[in-house]
């Protein structure tokens, strides 16, 4: 790996020598500040290394401040959508790629060095954005355009963009007093840094946990391939003749669904549900701090609580609307849940031939599988044999995208990636016009945060005739097959892949001249 930061695999090249003139400054071959010659202008992950990230972010901040200074010099009487809102919407464009690359590596690769850079970046960019959002002169210009919107002859997309920009300043604290603005800066900084640490603690605690099993009989019920994986886990950690069970790569789900030893299931369940409750990854105080800081910020901005603040710009709009939707469902859902639990417990009592048996949380997955087999004659685990990853992707996900939207996705092997796991695909519409690139990183790996998500390295943008196409990423944590074995998915993993690809479609199909309302 590149010296001083485990961002990319050891085979990566250092950036090329030479000087490049950008924004009036000289840079020694920083690939995050130079136009990429890769297809679609994709980031040169084969050249990016530690020393590139913060200089690129710092230069992006300098360019952002310079652009803001030009806007700030305008007279409110001369403020228009084109000379205020459009440049504000695009002022941080030079920050987009380095920040996205850092975020991608933080989520998908991890490591202490990445977190340190993320914390430094979050503080610098947060300060830069706060300085603009809380700038009275800038807000005066935005408000001048907003107040004259009805007479400006703006189309619906421009009005929506203007409205979002104006609301973002209100929600960011533009109307606060000078003293409140200083406190808001502190709150924003603390929330950002604590959230990064909170998320990293969960990732580290999840990936570092291991339960060593010395008696093979405790693994009864597990498939042979699962036992072999546990043995390989232990061998990699220098232990022979034992089995190492973790929380990643399907270990936890396999034990909870298949292990007949109830105490093993209990131990693993209790360890999983008590992550970050003590020790060096203790998140309890961090969680309290984040909740209280968010509440203070929301109330300073005029909201009753954080829920009211965050829902205002979402579909529901208010906590009351959420309650109106959820509360009528509560009784019906709770009743159905109690009935299903009673059925499952009755089945477990019969299965165990023990009238005193009481269902516990670590029993649910195990007996649910047994009940499903008894009722329907099948096991979900066996479906995996028919769900080959390549087939699900090409004959499932991509096939549906083509049938519904006429989109085709073709694998590209000439796009730089940061890890061999990452696959890249070129998306085109029904007429063969390019839509962008998809980066697919589906399998569990040390350092990658848990869950599944869709993000982007670059959003769609256009300025006149110049069009920049999106670079969309999908990241998952599917169970990794043993070397030489086929990559098979569970039914849950198949649903996850379809779900995340739905987000990717939004990234490919969203078009418009203003970043505020595209992507």
Model-assigned labels for residue ranges:
Residues 37-52, 102-121, 144-186, 246-285, ...:
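Short His/Asp/Glu-rich catalytic/ion-coordination signatures at enzyme active sites or charged loops
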Residues 157, 161, 193, 200, ...:
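Active-site-proximal, well-structured secondary-structure segments within enzyme catalytic domains
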Residues 382-389, 482-490, 518:
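Active-site rim elements
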């Amino acid at each position: 790996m590149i010296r001083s930061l485990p961002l990319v695999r050891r085979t990566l090249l250092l950036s090329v020598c030479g000087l490049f003139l950008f924004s009036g400054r000289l840079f020694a071959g920083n690939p995050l500040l130079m136009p990429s010659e890769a297809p679609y202008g994709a980031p040169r992950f084969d050249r990016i290394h530690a020393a590139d990230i913060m200089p690129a972010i710092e230069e992006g901040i300098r360019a952002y401040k310079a652009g803001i200074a030009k806007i700030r010099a305008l007279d409110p009487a001369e403020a228009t959508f084109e000379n205020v809102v459009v440049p504000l919407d695009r002022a941080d464009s030079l920050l987009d790629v380095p920040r996205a690359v850092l975020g991608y590596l933080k989520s998908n690769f991890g490591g202490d060095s990445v977190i340190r850079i993320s914390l430094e970046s979050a503080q610098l960019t947060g300060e830069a954005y706060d300085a603009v959002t809380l700038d009275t002169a800038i807000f005066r210009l935005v408000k001048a355009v907003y107040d004259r919107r009805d007479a400006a002859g703006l189309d619906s997309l421009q009005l929506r963009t203007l409205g979002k920009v104006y609301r973002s300043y209100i929600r960011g604290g533009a109307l606060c007093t000078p003293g409140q603005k200083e406190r808001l800066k502190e709150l924003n900084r603390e929330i950002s840094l604590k959230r990064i640490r909170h998320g990293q603690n969960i990732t580290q605690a999840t990936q570092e946990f291991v339960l060593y099993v010395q008696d093979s009989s405790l693994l009864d019920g597990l498939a042979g391939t699962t036992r072999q994986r546990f043995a390989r886990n232990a061998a990699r950690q220098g232990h022979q003749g034992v089995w190492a069970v973790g929380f990643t790569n399907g270990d936890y789900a396999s034990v909870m669904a298949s292990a007949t030893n109830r105490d093993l299931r209990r131990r693993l369940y209790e360890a999983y549900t008590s992550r970050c409750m003590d020790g060096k990854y203790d998140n309890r105080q961090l969680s309290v701090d984040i909740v209280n800081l968010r509440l203070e910020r929301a109330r300073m901005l005029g909201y009753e609580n954080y829920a009211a603040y965050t829902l205002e710009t979402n579909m529901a709009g208010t906590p009351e609307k959420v309650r109106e939707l959820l509360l009528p469902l509560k009784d019906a859902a709770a009743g159905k849940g109690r009935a299903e639990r009673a059925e499952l417990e009755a089945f477990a009592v019969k299965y165990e031939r023990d009238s005193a048996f009481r269902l516990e949380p670590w029993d649910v997955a195990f007996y649910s599988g047994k009940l499903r087999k008894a009722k329907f004659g099948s096991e979900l685990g066996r479906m995996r044999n028919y769900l080959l990853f390549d087939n699900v992707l090409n004959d499932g996900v991509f096939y549906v995208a083509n049938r519904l939207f006429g989109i085709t996705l073709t694998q590209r092997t000439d796009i730089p990636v940061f890890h061999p796991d990452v696959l890249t695909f070129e998306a085109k519409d029904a007429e063969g016009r390019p839509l962008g690139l998809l980066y697919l990183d589906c399998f569990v790996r040390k350092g990658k945060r848990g869950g599944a998500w869709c993000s982007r390295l670059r959003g769609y943008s256009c300025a006149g005739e110049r069009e920049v196409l999106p670079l969309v990423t999908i990241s998952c944590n599917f169970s990794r097959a043993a070397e030489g074995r086929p990559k098979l998915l569970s039914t849950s993993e198949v649903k996850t892949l379809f779900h995340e690809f739905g987000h990717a479609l939004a990234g490919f199909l969203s078009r418009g001249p203003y970043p505020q309302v595209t992507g």
